[in-house]
Every structure is written in C-alpha cells, then in structure tokens.
Design a protein with these regions (language model features):
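P-loop (Walker A) phosphate-binding loop of NTP-binding proteins
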Residues: 459
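Extended, folded cores of ATP/NTP-driven motor/assembly subunits in large transport
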Residues: 2-418
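Walker A/P-loop NTP-binding active-site region of P-loop NTPases
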Residues: 462-515
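Conserved P-loop NTPase
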Residues: 742-797
Length: 801
C-alpha cells in the first residue's frame, strides 16, 4: 500500500491523538499512513466494529417505501412512526443515518436484462428486443446505486459487554422498521467494510475483494483492503483520495421550517454523493434544564431592555424583535419537551461529494448547494476540517465534526429517509417500463410473488393489449414458460404467428375444434379427476341453460350421475378416440327418466345437433405448441362466453400437464370482464383463479370495461388473489372505485388520470410504482404488438406481400 505524504505531527488533543501512542524520546516519529487515518480499530466478522477504545458500533441496511406517493393520512402515520423511531434512542446511543449514491458497475445490470441469441428463426426480433432493453436501461440512472443505512454506537468496556447491548438495540431497530413497513437487515463485517471501500473508491470500477481468511494468510489488516492509495488534505476546502477529488460540507439550517422533501431532493441527484446525518439524543432532564436556563437568560435580557427603555423615556414594551422571537421559540420548545413527547437531539448533516476531476467536483458541490438554497439553507464547506468530514461520512456512528444543531424530534424527523420504491429484480424478471419518479428501469419477476395472478386494466387506447403483448414477448425470450392467450377480439394472432405459435380459430364455420369434455388423469390433486371436471361441466350447463340463480339440486345430481357413465370408457382405456363429447353427455341425459334430465338435454340440443354444434367434436388441433392463441372473435355473441369458458378449461388441462413437468403456464385472458359478468361463469373462473398458483399457472386478466369488472360479486376474490396489477389510464368513475378498492392516494391516482399511452401504476405485492413506457415505433416488434387498426393493416399488407 502506498503511503500518504508526510504530515505534521498531530498536536496533543488533536484528531489523530487517539490513534497513536506518543513517541518515546529518541524514538523516530512514525509516519502517518493512509490506514492510520481511517478512524476505527477493529472490524469483527459479525459486524461489530471497535471504533475507539471503548466505543462499539453496528450497522443496519434498510430499504425504501413509498412515502412521497402515499396518501396524506398514510404520510402522517409514517411521519409519526418515524418520530417514535427517533425517540427510541436515548442519550447513551449515538446513531448515524447514511445515504449513499454511488456509480455501480453497469455489467451487473446488463446481466439482468441480457438476452442471448439462440441461433433460431426468432433471433432477429429477440436481439431487437434485447437492444431495446439496453436503450431503456441507458435512459435511467440504474448505474447509480442508492443505499440507506443506520449505524448506532454505544460505549462499553469490552466487546463482550457491548455485544448483547448492540444486539438488543439492533432487534429493537428492526422491529421499529417493521412497524414502518420497511425491510431491513443487519450487516456483517465484510458488508460494512465494502461500504467504506466504496466510499474511498467511488470513482473506480474495481470490485471489493476481501475475506477474513485472507487476513490470517497475509497478516494484513482490514484497513489494508479498503484504504485508497493516498490521502491529500493540502487545501482547506477539498481533498484527494487516490485519483479522486472530494469535498466535505455541512448543512447550515437557516429556514424556520423545512418540508419533508428536503432529503429526497438531495438523494435525487444523479451524482456520487454521501449524506450523513449524525444524531445524539440529549438527556431529557438536561434538555429541559438547558431550555429553562435559556429562557431565564432571555427574560433577564428583556428586563434589562425594559429598564433601559424606562431610563430613556420610551415605552417599555418596545424591545428588540429578535429577543421577543427567541423567547417565544424557547417557550414553545420547552412546552414540546414537557408535554408533546418530544426529545432534543444534537444533529450534524454532512455532505460528501466526489468526482474524477476538480471541475466535476465543483459542479457537483454547486448543484448540492443549489438544492440547499432552494430550502433556505446553506451548504458550507468544512474549512480545514475536510479529513474529519470525510471520516465522519463513514458509517461508524462517530461524529468528528464539532458543528451541531439542536433540534426537537419533529424537526429532526423532517429528514424523512423514504422517497419511492424501486423494482429491479434478478432471476426471470421481465421489463415493465421506467419508474416515472426516478426514471429507473422496472424489472420484476411475478413468480416471486405469493400470488402471481395479475390484471391489466386500462381505457381503450391506453396500451393495455400492447402491455400484455410486450410481457408475452418477454416471457417467450427469457423463460421456458408456456403461453396461452384467449383472444376474443382477434388482436394477438400477428404476434403469436411471428413467434412460431399456434393460432386456433374457433367459429361456427371453422374446422378447428376443441372438445369441452377433454380431460387428463392429472386434472385434479386427488385420484378423482372427475370431481373437478364436474364443476366445469356444471358451469357450462348453467351458462347454456341461462340459469342465473344456478341449477336446481336435482339437475346437478342428474349431471353428476351421468358423468362417470360418460367418461367410463376413456378412464378404462385413456386413448384420444375414447374421449367423450357433448353428444355423449346429451345421449346419457336422454336415457335418464327424470324430467330435469330431459330439460337439460333439450337445452344442450342446439349445441349438439343444431346450428351451434361447433363444440360437439373431438379436439382436432395439436395443443402442444409452446405458445397458443385461441382466436374466438368470430364465435358470435351467443357462443363467445361459452367459448371463453371452454378455453379456460383447456388451459387448466395444460396447466395440470405442465405441473407434472414442473413448468409454468402463462394464461392471458382479454375481455376478462365477460367471464365475471355472468354468475354461471364467474364462480368457476374465480375457483380456477385461486387454484392456478398452486399448479404453476400465472393468469392475467385484461379488460377495459372496469365497471363491468367491478360490478361482479366475485371481484373481491379476484383482487384478493392478484398480487400484480398493471393499471393504465382510467375513466373518472372507475378511478374513484379503484382508489377505494386498492387504497390509492390522490397523488398516485394522478398517474392514471388523463395519462398518456403506456403510463400508469404498477402494483407488485405491497409495492406501488408509477411507470412510463414509450416503445420505439420503428421496431419490427412494434408492428407485431400494436392494436391500432391502421398499423395492424400495414402488418397484414406486409404479410400478404
């Protein structure tokens, strides 16, 4: 390790006094090294750091929640909980909030969005999609990683004494974060060292390479692995560490009031930045005594001014305005401390800017100062305290800057550490646009949700079908999942055909047939596949008979009696040619004596022997293609709902087969409200919706008719069993209903109010993120995915040519 330039011997009581022994007489003075400048003594594997001889600290990383987008009521709740969080810390605990923005190696992000060529006929659109993802990644600032930490320290005689106390505080902090709905976890020694390494090497791309075993092998210390090549604190206003320029500043709070957006504005900068808020609680009795003393001093000064006024012959009530103002503020603070559950804290807010060049550094500091000025504060450089400022920016909970501001709990809590959540997951994650607040790419894996079922909701022209097609394309390129589409409007076949999928056209004139009586031996969990199949047949018959209030018990019993007879031949010898059809059920019903059986058979007659007999055939299409589209546009009004229900049963067949092969099945249902509109189909659809997750199915309902969807009695079950909602622009009446149903704040609601195509809100579990997605219209994929009539016409012309 290259050592720093020789420095003057630190004076007694100076900053470095605690890190050295005083040289003996005639002993050559030791050179001050970079490692000795880093202000801690030991870093344990468990994350406990001995900062000074009797000072120990631990660090907890915490994540963001949607504070800026929350409803005012929720904001107030979060703010009050944050105040309670701060009040937890008594005078024996120092703590430091660290907010670190640093550039990351983009290769990590590129790995997540990487789509490799497969050397097949789809490589042209596959690589086009991959290029689009790279362009979207470049638009955001995903290369800038934002992390948040809280570090707390206590005084103890030994690590044995410190450890149980630190662990108890850590548990309390994690529980307090849980109350706030914030994910958090404690850091181990390696993770804490990595933060310091990244602070010292912010402008470098070299990864942190360290393990405690290497210390034993090499005889080096932890500091040797994190230290830069050199420190240079020549100038009083900035410094250098290695080849990186840096400047440490503090926030001078001049404004009488601050907003809860102040910290968010600083953290929104797209430059390397470390914001450290050091907080030391003051003993409550001492704080009250201090304020009372100040009030006494102010009253004494007021009396002196009044005496002076009397001697001078003017009104004794006329006193300096500052004196009156300070007196009123002091009394208010005293009242807060005594009766409003407020504490007093000594707070230091530090900023560490770094850059590759002096010019870039000055620009970054200027930008930071501009934000401070916006809130009537000033950003002051730590003149001749640059080293202390840098070292105090390390998450060690040891403030070496002697500049503190006394603030009450509420005033301290105004630095709310929460802004907006990000969603960028690894694994089988798919692209869902850019975060409308941070401009970062949204990558999410629905399989990681407790319930991956989803809805895509939007008005006509908002981009709902396009969004579904984009997800289908992404699934096809990056996973091995099967994809099935129920297409009542004939909008999906261009994409499905382009991806080598199978389009099954079902209509009264089509020669493509699917048999509603199809079953496989894996149809249900138990050894009785007929049990669940009977639910479907009953729903089918209810729909055919128009039984709005359901079928009579006698009618259900008759059907239930017939089903084992109808399926007996197939179950004894499961060959495709032995699969029964609706005609077999019809014949069996005719053989029964009950009038209910004859009534059902009469209702079935038009579907068996009449003009609507399209579903009375053996399935004559192969259903083993990876991507299948059931085009039921030409079925007509009488058969469309029936067709959607039958397609849903075919999908269930596929799901049960895929489950045994441990394969997921994605099912997209356009015009989903049609299945929920009728009581006969709604109950069965909801039952399937609930069962899909357990069997590896991932259904997605797509609709523009929100009123019809929300009018269904079953919508509560759909929402409760859907952890993924992709909400685009909504009509006025629908917005209010959805806001109440999903607890959407007015601010969040603005993202689905008169929003542009491809803009809205993404609900992923408990995370709500506003998104925007402007797809490049020049891409070949766009032509395959668009649903605009004029653009779809161009696709047809190209295909025919």
């Amino acid at each position: 390790m290259v050592k720093s330039e020789p420095k003057k011997k630190p004076q007694p009581g100076g900053f470095f006094q605690k890190f050295f022994r005083k040289p003996e007489k005639n002993q050559k003075e030791q050179r001050l090294t970079v490692q000795r400048s880093i202000p801690y003594l030991e870093m344990g594997r468990d994350g406990i750091c001995r900062v000074e001889e009797h000072l120990y600290s631990k660090t907890v990383r915490f994540y963001d929640i949607n504070y800026q987008l929350a409803q005012n009521e929720d904001k107030n709740t979060i703010f009050e909980s944050w105040c309670d969080f701060l009040n937890y810390f008594d005078a024996s605990i120092r703590f430091q909030l660290s907010f670190i923005n640093h550039k990351s190696d983009m290769s990590e992000y590129n790995k997540v969005i990487q789509i490799e060529p497969q050397h097949d006929q789809f490589d042209d659109v596959r690589m086009e999609y991959a290029q689009m993802l790279k362009q979207q990644l470049a638009k955001g600032n995903n290369g800038l990683v934002r992390t948040k930490y809280i570090t707390f320290s206590i005084e103890a005689k030994s690590v044995r004494e410190a450890k149980p106390r630190l662990e108890r505080i850590e548990t309390d902090i994690l529980n307090n974060f849980k109350v706030l709905g914030v994910k958090a976890y404690p850091l181990n020694g390696v993770e804490r060292l990595q933060i310091m390494y990244e602070t010292f090497h912010q402008e470098e791309q070299q990864k942190f390479d360290f393990s405690y075993d290497r210390i034993l092998q090499s005889g080096m210390t932890t500091k040797d692995f994190i230290a830069p090549t050199s420190f240079l604190f020549k100038s009083g206003k900035d410094f250098m560490m290695g080849d990186t320029y840096g400047a440490a500043s503090y926030l001078n709070i001049l404004a009488p009031e601050l907003t809860d957006k102040v910290l968010a504005e600083f953290l929104d900068m797209d430059k390397n930045l470390v914001v450290s808020i050091h907080v030391q609680s003051v003993d409550q009795l001492k704080a009250i005594k201090l304020i009372k003393g100040k009030i006494t001093d102010l009253d004494r000064m007021k009396i002196e001014e009044q005496k002076k006024a009397v001697r001078s012959g003017y009104d004794m009530e006329i006193i300096p305005s500052d004196l009156a103002t300070y007196g009123g503020e002091a009394k208010k603070i005293l009242d807060d401390l005594q009766s409003r559950n407020e504490r007093m804290f000594l707070v230091t807010v530090l900023f560490l800017n770094t850059a590759k060049t002096k010019q870039e550094l000055d620009s970054a500091v200027f930008q930071t100062a501009g934000i401070a000025q916006k809130f009537n504060c000033t950003l002051n450089r730590l003149d001749y305290l640059q080293e202390q400022g840098l070292m105090s920016s390390l998450p060690l909970a040891n403030n070496l800057v002697p500049i503190k501001r006394a603030l009450t709990t509420t005033s301290t809590a105004i630095f709310v550490p929460f802004t907006t959540q990000e969603l960028f997951m690894e694994g089988d994650s798919l692209y869902y646009g850019l975060n409308a607040v941070s401009n970062n790419m949204i990558m999410a894996d629905r399989k990681q949700l407790k319930n991956p079922n989803g809805l895509i909701l939007g008005t006509p022209g908002s981009g709902k079908s396009f969004s579904a097609k984009r997800e289908i394309t992404n699934v096809f390129f990056t996973t091995t999942d099967d994809i099935i589409v129920a297409d009542p409007e004939g909008e999906y076949y261009p994409l499905v055909e382009a991806l080598g999928g199978q389009v099954i056209h079902i209509s009264s004139t089509s020669k493509d047939y699917i048999n509603p009586m199809d079953i496989n031996l894996n149809y249900a969990d138990d050894d009785n596949p007929l049990g669940m199949k009977s639910d479907f047949i009953l729903s089918l018959c209810e729909l055919i008979m128009g039984a709005r209030d359901g079928m009579e018990p006698e009618e259900k019993s008759v059907i239930d009696r017939c089903l084992p007879l109808v399926y007996q031949k197939y179950l004894n010898d499961p060959k495709p040619e032995n699969m029964p059809t609706l005609g077999d059920l019809y014949d069996c019903l005719r053989e029964q004596k009950e009038r209910q059986a004859q009534r059902i058979a009469t209702a079935l007659e038009i579907y068996v022997n009449g003009s609507l007999r399209v579903f009375n055939h053996q399935t004559n299409v192969e259903l083993d293609n990876r991507i299948i589209c059931f085009d039921i546009k030409e079925l007509g009004k009488q058969l469309k709902k029936l067709g959607m229900l039958i397609v849903q049963d075919q999908v269930w067949n596929r799901v049960t087969i895929n489950r045994s092969g441990k394969k997921n099945t994605r099912y997209y249902i356009d015009e989903f409200h049609l299945l929920l509109k009728e009581e006969q189909t709604a109950a069965y659809s909801v039952e399937i919706w609930k069962r899909f997750r357990k069997w590896g199915g991932i259904p997605t309902g797509i609709t523009q008719n929100i009123k019809d969807l929300l009018a269904s009695r079953e919508i509560e079950n759909i929402f409760e069993n859907s952890d993924f909602i992709y909400m685009l622009n909504q009509a006025s009446g629908d917005r209010q209903i959805l806001a109440k149903q999903l607890n959407i704040s007015p601010f969040q609601l603005s993202y689905v109010t008169n929003s542009n195509e491809g803009e809205g809100l993404l609900f992923y579990g408990n995370t709500i993120i506003p998104f925007k997605d402007k797809f490049d219209t020049t891409l070949k994929l766009y032509g395959l995915m668009t649903t605009k009539p004029n653009e779809m016409g161009k696709y047809k012309e190209k295909k025919e040519a």
